[in-house]
């Protein structure tokens, strides 16, 4: 009882002893009396309730002691409930969560981090290889661009050299033979028929010269260009295979003012002999002769004329006069210089030769004369346009080579752009993988922190 302190302490000791025996000896909850002593409480629940409700204004010392014991009981009881709950319910869940975290770390997060790291390294290596390939491709493009320029210059020089050679050769050899072998009805007595003959001859020469130039110049150039395109790796199209130089020859335009001279001319006539003599003998306007100086150069000195200029003018007027005065004077000089029989024999020979040439001056001979005059004039005029024609060939070649260059540049830039696109895609993949790797590492760190807290 609370009114008898001695009895209260005695009863308390008895209860303490009985409870210790119960907990240690009978129940075996604790192994020592000290542990059991700490779990024995002497409290009054009603008294503690009154104190908390404020019914006891001035509690005694024993009341305060019992209230403190009750507070210790509440604290130990709540801790016991918490420990019991952890052991019976929350403990297995915490262990299961910790096990799941460890499994996630070992089977998912760590391998995933390693996989992402390996992919990042592989993509970085691949990007480095692509960058090296881009640099190598740019250097290769520069080298190929220089080689292409050199090849273009070589083809241009070849076109100039071969074109000039082919044209001169065709003008020198093909035109005379082609004109001579041309066969078409020839009627010199009809001017309209001569014009038709000339137009047919021009068309024949146009086709023949164009075909020869195509075979000798265009086809070799086309083969070299195709070989160059194959070396550059360009796609050979039908347009590239069909390319050829355009050589539009129009002989009719060159010979539009051609007027053939089909009159009979005696080869031993005075005019013919005069032209031959005029071409062989140096006149007062003859070419200059050269004299070598001490310094190695040559000095031009005029050749002295065999006959004075005044004498040539007199002879020319006599020979070329339309009257018979020249013939009479020359005949008188011949009779005076030679005997009559010799003059008659020479006259007979000259007359016989004249009759032979006049009889041989047939339509075929006139056609040969026409072809000879036509061939000489056409050769002369074509030679003057050789350089202009070669320049036209060069311009066509440069235009085609410019198209080849543009095609090569487009293909090279397409390859370079493809490499740059692949590099950019790898860079994006690397960045996204790095972000993923960082997130995985954060999750791993949070999991480790949660596992340590559990």
Swiss-Prot record:
It is a multi-pass membrane protein. It holds the Pfam family Fzo_mitofusin. It comes from the Eukaryota. Residues 30-33 are annotated as: G5 motif. GTP binds at residue 44. Changing residue 355 to I: In strain: Isolate SIM1, Isolate SIM3 and Isolate SIM6. The keyword Glycoprotein does not apply. GO terms for molecular function: GTP binding; GTPase activity. Residues 1-111 form the Dynamin-type G domain. Keywords: Coiled coil, Developmental protein, Differentiation, GTP-binding, Hydrolase, Membrane, Mitochondrion, Mitochondrion outer membrane, Nucleotide-binding, Spermatogenesis, Transmembrane, Transmembrane helix. Residues 1-322, 362-454 are cytoplasmic. The chain crosses the membrane at residues 323-335, 339-361. It catalyses: GTP + H2O = GDP + phosphate + H(+). Changing residue 285 to A: In strain: Isolate SIM3, Isolate SIM6 and Isolate SIM7. Residues 336-338 are mitochondrial intermembrane. Residues 112-162, 411-434 form a coiled coil. InterPro entries: Fzo/mitofusin_HR2, G_DYNAMIN_dom, Mitofusin_fam. Signal peptide: none annotated. Changing residue 304 to L: In strain: Isolate SIM7. It is found in: Mitochondrion outer membrane. Belongs to the TRAFAC class dynamin-like GTPase superfamily. Dynamin/Fzo/YdjA family. Mitofusin subfamily. Essential transmembrane GTPase, which mediates mitochondrial fusion during spermatogenesis. In early spermatocytes, fusion of mitochondria give rise to two organelles named Nebenkern and constitutes an important step in mitochondria morphology, which is balanced between fusion and fission. Essential for fertility. PANTHER family: TRANSMEMBRANE GTPASE FZO1 (PTHR10465), TRANSMEMBRANE GTPASE MARF-RELATED (PTHR10465:SF3). This is Transmembrane GTPase fzo. It comes from Drosophila simulans.
């Amino acid at each position: 009882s609370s009114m008898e302190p001695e009895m209260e302490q005695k009863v308390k000791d008895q209860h303490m002893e009985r409870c210790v025996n119960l907990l240690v000896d009978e129940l075996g909850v604790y192994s020592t009396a000290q542990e059991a002593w700490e779990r024995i409480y002497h409290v009054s629940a009603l008294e503690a309730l009154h104190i908390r409700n404020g019914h006891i204004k001035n509690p005694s010392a024993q009341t305060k002691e019992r209230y403190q014991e009750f507070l210790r009981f509440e604290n130990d009881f709540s801790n016991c409930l918490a420990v019991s709950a952890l052991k019976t319910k929350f403990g297995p869940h915490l262990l299961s969560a910790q096990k799941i975290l460890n499994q996630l770390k070992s089977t998912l997060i760590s391998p995933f981090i390693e996989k992402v790291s390996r992919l990042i390294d592989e993509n970085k290596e691949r990007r480095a290889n692509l960058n090296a390939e881009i640099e190598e491709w740019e250097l290769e493009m520069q080298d190929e661009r220089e080689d292409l320029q050199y090849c273009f210059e070589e083809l241009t020089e070849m076109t100039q050299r071969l074109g000039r050679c082919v044209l001169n050769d065709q003008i020198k050899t093909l035109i005379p033979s082609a004109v001579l072998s041309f066969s078409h009805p020839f009627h010199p007595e009809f001017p309209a028929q001569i014009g038709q003959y000339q137009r047919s001859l021009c068309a024949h020469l146009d086709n023949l010269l164009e075909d020869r130039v195509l075979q000798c110049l265009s086809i070799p150039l086309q083969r070299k260009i195709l070989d160059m395109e194959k070396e550059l790796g360009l796609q050979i199209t039908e347009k590239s295979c069909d390319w050829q130089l355009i050589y539009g020859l129009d002989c009719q335009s060159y010979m539009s003012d051609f007027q053939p001279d089909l009159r009979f001319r005696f080869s031993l006539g005075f005019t013919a002999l005069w032209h031959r003599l005029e071409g062989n003998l140096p006149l007062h306007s003859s070419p200059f002769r050269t004299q070598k100086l001490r310094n190695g150069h040559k000095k031009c000195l005029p050749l002295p004329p065999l006959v004075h200029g005044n004498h040539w003018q007199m002879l020319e007027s006599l020979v070329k006069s339309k009257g018979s005065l020249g013939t009479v004077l020359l005949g008188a000089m011949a009779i005076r210089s030679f005997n009559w029989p010799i003059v008659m024999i020479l006259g007979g020979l000259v007359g016989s030769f004249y009759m032979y040439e006049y009889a041989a001056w047939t339509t075929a001979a006139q056609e040969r004369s026409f072809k000879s005059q036509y061939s000489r004039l056409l050769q002369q005029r074509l030679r003057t346009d050789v350089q202009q024609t070669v320049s036209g060939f060069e311009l066509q070649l440069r235009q085609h080579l410019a198209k080849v260059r543009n095609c090569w540049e487009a293909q090279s830039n397409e390859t370079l752009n493809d490499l740059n696109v692949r590099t950019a895609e790898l860079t994006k993949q690397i960045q996204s993988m790095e972000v993923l790797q960082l997130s995985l590492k954060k999750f791993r760190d949070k999991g480790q922190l949660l596992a340590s807290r559990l």
